[in-house]
């Protein structure tokens, strides 16, 4: 049995005990993951995760903070707004992956007070968005930051996001298209994501599928169903569009909603 499987079998009390102890950093790491996976609302769990954002004991060989990363990820899934300010502070972490996880969780929490700190990570624009020296990633988690700004509704960041449409990395361009559609509702941004479904690289087609699902772009339904990618991902994308559409139609199933359901049925 793997460590993940063992952790999954924990009870709430075991997970809380494991994150509170200090001798075994591995157990603390898995406990943070456990709280996020099971969306635990227990106040002890929330407080332990908030404390874990400042942990100094669990360090990776490259100087990173594994426990902080998992804590930041989990706090977004719990939906507790008490995490907003600590996550904003985590955007200044020296660990790229902590910053990335914090941005993703702030997107989930959707609190507008995170906007200035997220915008700050776009400082320098595309010219500054280069590979970190000796690392496999860029200097900032631009994809996560741009997506968060779009989801939160940071219209003040439109001018800062637009230049990223020309970034050399496709996923960052897609993030910019996604955010700009969310912030402007201009169809040409979503249509460019639809065009990306015809790209040569499967990984990029997958990204475009998820982005179209995230923005709820109904006209993309047919293109998503026909895309060369796993049916499971196409279903996730269509489900996202349907859920967004139902929110806009006050849960009324109209012709567009029925078509989306039919497309989903065709993929099962």
UniProtKB/Swiss-Prot annotation:
Its EC number is 4.-.-.-. InterPro entries: ARM-like, ARM-type_fold, PBS_lyase_HEAT. It is an enzyme of class 4 (lyase). Pfam families: HEAT_2, HEAT_PBS. Gene3D superfamilies: Leucine-rich Repeat Variant (1.25.10.10). Keywords: Antenna complex, Lyase, Phycobilisome. GO terms for cellular component: phycobilisome. Signal peptide: none annotated. One of its GO terms (molecular function) is lyase activity. CpcE and CpcF associate to form a lyase. Required for the chromophorylation of the cpcA gene product. Belongs to the CpcE/RpcE/PecE family. This is Phycocyanobilin lyase subunit alpha. It comes from Picosynechococcus sp. (strain ATCC 27264 / PCC 7002 / PR-6) (Agmenellum quadruplicatum).
């Amino acid at each position: 049995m793997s460590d993940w499987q063992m952790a999954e079998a924990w009870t709430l009390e075991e997970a809380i005990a494991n994150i509170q102890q200090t001798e075994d950093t591995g157990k603390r790491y898995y406990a943070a993951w456990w709280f996020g996976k099971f969306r635990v609302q227990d106040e002890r769990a929330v407080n332990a995760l908030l404390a874990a954002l400042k942990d100094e004991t669990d360090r990776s060989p490259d100087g990173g903070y594994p426990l902080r990363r998992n804590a930041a990820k989990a706090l977004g899934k719990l939906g507790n707004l008490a995490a907003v300010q600590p996550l904003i502070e985590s955007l200044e972490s020296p660990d790229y992956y902590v910053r990335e996880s914090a941005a993703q969780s702030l997107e989930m929490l959707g609190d507008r007070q995170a906007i200035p700190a997220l915008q700050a990570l776009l400082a320098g624009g595309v010219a500054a968005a280069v590979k970190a020296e000796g690392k496999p990633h860029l200097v900032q988690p631009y994809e996560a930051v741009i997506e968060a700004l779009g989801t939160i509704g940071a219209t003040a960041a439109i001018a800062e996001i637009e230049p990223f449409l020309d970034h050399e990395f496709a996923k960052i361009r897609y993030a910019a298209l996604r955010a700009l559609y969310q912030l402007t509702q201009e169809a040409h941004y979503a249509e460019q994501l639809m065009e990306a479904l015809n790209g040569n690289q499967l990984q990029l087609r997958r990204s475009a599928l998820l982005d179209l699902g995230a923005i709820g772009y109904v006209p993309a339904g047919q293109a998503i169903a026909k895309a060369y990618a796993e049916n499971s991902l196409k279903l996730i994308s269509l489900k996202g569009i349907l859920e967004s559409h139902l929110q806009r139609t006050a849960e009324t199933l109209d012709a567009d909603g029925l078509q989306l359901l039919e497309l989903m049925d065709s993929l099962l």
